[in-house]
């Protein structure tokens, strides 16, 4: 089979305790747009980047929400032209553990990044686009 024209996309499905509330929060805080909504399960996108919401199913131990287990093992990265404005918007909508944007020296140059935790326990990092702009440059190896 010739896969030369095949493409692959990667997305995340966020398990949340309250699906419909999560959809409204991501709309208000991130400017997410709804692709489809089945009630408790929804497809959204931010600036064309899709992600999905699924309300936690009681008893389904393989897919608990962060609020059920008291932690998350994933950090979601958002790259934008104005990281501070997005973090401020999330904070105004009820985000917690807000970290203001600060400068970080990286192999690809200065990277401005901050973050927050959404009301459903997911950790978000929000930064400028420097990591995306400089991906073509080889990084120094070990």
Q: Which sequence ranges carry the predicted segments?
A:
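Vicinal oxygen chelate
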Residues: 1-13, 23-117, 127-142
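Short, surface-exposed ligand-recognition loops at beta-strand->loop->(often short) alpha-helix junctions
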Residues: 14-18
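Conserved ATPase active-site switch/coordination loops adjacent to the nucleotide-binding site
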Residues: 120
């Amino acid at each position: 089979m010739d896969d030369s024209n095949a493409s692959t996309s990667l997305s995340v499905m966020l398990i949340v305790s309250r699906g419909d509330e999560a959809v409204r929060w991501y709309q208000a805080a991130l400017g997410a747009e709804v692709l489809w909504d089945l009630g408790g399960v929804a497809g959204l996108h931010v600036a064309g980047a899709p992600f999905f919401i699924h309300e936690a199913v009681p008893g389904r131990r393989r897919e608990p929400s962060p609020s059920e287990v008291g932690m998350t093992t994933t950090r979601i990265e958002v790259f934008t032209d104005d990281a501070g404005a997005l973090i401020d918007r999330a904070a105004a909508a009820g985000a917690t553990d807000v970290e203001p944007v600060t400068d970080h020296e990286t192999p690809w140059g200065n990277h401005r990044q901050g973050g927050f935790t959404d009301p459903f326990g997911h950790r978000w990092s929000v930064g400028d686009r420097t990591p995306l702009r400089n991906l073509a440059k080889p990084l120094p190896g070990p």
